[in-house]
């Protein structure tokens, strides 16, 4: 039996639309992500468990884990009879890389079960392909950090899909999921087909400056450059209370904030534990909309997807 855990991730990070993402893990030790178990069997089966299992498609072939198994078998050129279990702990359409968690855990578990026939680069390419079936286009800003850990910059040149960017140990990521769903496809459809020249220049300046600040170890500058001129001005209308929440967390002391992925999760970066706790308390009282919502104080998950049992 192989059991693999794949962590939540926060894509875009305001400054890097479709090219930047970070894996995150709660500081209290909770596992924020999906778990997939693979066992040898006579025929294929898939069982769904976990807090958000009831939100999965009722038709098994529409389940992304089934599609991962099917695509992996195709890659190896043979049928692999296994019993798979998906522990769906991540809300769907949350902006926390929910589909990436399932895809990464499923493909990594299959690869481990079969003795690692695929290298990490090929595996990551498959992960991007499968996750793209749900989000509508291939982009690696969730699957890369989820699989490899840390903060990842998408390269997609010279056979390099992504490379790690150094983060800051003092940064605490407060993630508030309000309990409503925003589909990635819907959030992409709301974006303009073309952008003004000054917005393109500002975006390039912010992203280049952010990467420079990370490598030159300037956390204050890095946080100051986490601005989004590409998606947030258009997507915030999909998120009730988002603008007020951003203003409130800034007043409490967050050094940066924005939409996690395509939303509705809000992220707020803090550089002090007491500030992070106050931000989390405010968001828990004011940004959450129902019982499915939650707030976690997180750090970068530098390990990425990992085998829990083998």
Swiss-Prot record:
Per the record, the major location class is cytoplasm
**So where does ATP get bound?**
91-101
Q: Which GO terms describe its cellular component?
A: cytoplasm
Where it sits in the cell: the answer is: Cytoplasm
Q: In which pathway does it act?
A: Amino-acid biosynthesis; L-threonine biosynthesis; L-threonine from L-aspartate: step 4/5
Q: Which GO terms describe its biological process?
A: threonine biosynthetic process
- List the EC numbers from the record: 2.7.1.39
Q: Which UniProt keywords apply?
A: Amino-acid biosynthesis, ATP-binding, Cytoplasm, Kinase, Nucleotide-binding, Threonine biosynthesis, Transferase
GO molecular function term, any single one: ATP binding
PANTHER family attached here?
HOMOSERINE KINASE, HOMOSERINE/4-DIPHOSPHOCYTIDYL-2-C-METHYL-D-ERYTHRITOL KINASE
Q: Which family does it belong to?
A: Belongs to the GHMP kinase family. Homoserine kinase subfamily.
Q: What does this protein do?
A: Catalyzes the ATP-dependent phosphorylation of L-homoserine to L-homoserine phosphate.
* Record-given protein name: Homoserine kinase
Could you tell me which species this protein originates from?
Escherichia coli O1:K1 / APEC
């Amino acid at each position: 039996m192989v059991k693999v855990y794949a962590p939540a991730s926060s894509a875009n990070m305001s400054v890097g639309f479709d090219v930047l993402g970070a894996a995150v893990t709660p500081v209290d030790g909770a596992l924020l992500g999906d778990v997939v178990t693979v066992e040898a069997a006579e025929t294929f089966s898939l069982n769904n468990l976990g807090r958000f299992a009831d939100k999965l498609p009722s038709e098994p072939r529409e389940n992304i884990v089934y599609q991962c198994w099917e695509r992996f078998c195709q890659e190896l050129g043979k049928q692999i009879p296994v019993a798979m279990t998906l522990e769906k702990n991540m809300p769907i359409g949350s902006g926390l890389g929910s589909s990436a968690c399932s895809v990464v855990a499923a493909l990594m578990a299959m690869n481990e079960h079969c003795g690692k026939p695929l290298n990490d680069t090929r595996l990551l390419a498959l992960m991007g392909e499968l996750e793209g079936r749900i989000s509508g286009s291939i982009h690696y800003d969730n699957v890369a950090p989820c699989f490899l850990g840390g903060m990842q910059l998408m390269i997609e040149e010279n056979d390099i899909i992504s490379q790690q960017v150094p983060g800051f140990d003092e940064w605490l990521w407060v993630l508030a999921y309000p309990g409503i769903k925003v589909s990635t496809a819907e959030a992409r459809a709301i974006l303009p087909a073309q952008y003004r020249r000054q917005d393109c220049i500002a975006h390039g300046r912010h992203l280049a400056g952010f990467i420079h600040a990370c490598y030159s170890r300037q956390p204050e500058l890095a946080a100051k450059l986490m601005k989004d001129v590409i998606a947030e001005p258009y997507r915030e209308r999909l998120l009730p209370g988002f603008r007020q929440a951003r203003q409130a967390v800034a007043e409490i002391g967050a050094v940066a904030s924005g939409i996690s992925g395509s939303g509705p999760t809000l992220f707020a970066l803090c550089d002090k534990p007491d500030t992070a706790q106050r931000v989390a308390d405010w968001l828990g009282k004011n940004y959450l909309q129902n019982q499915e919502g939650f707030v976690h104080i997180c750090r970068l998950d530098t390990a990425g997807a990992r085998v829990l049992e083998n």
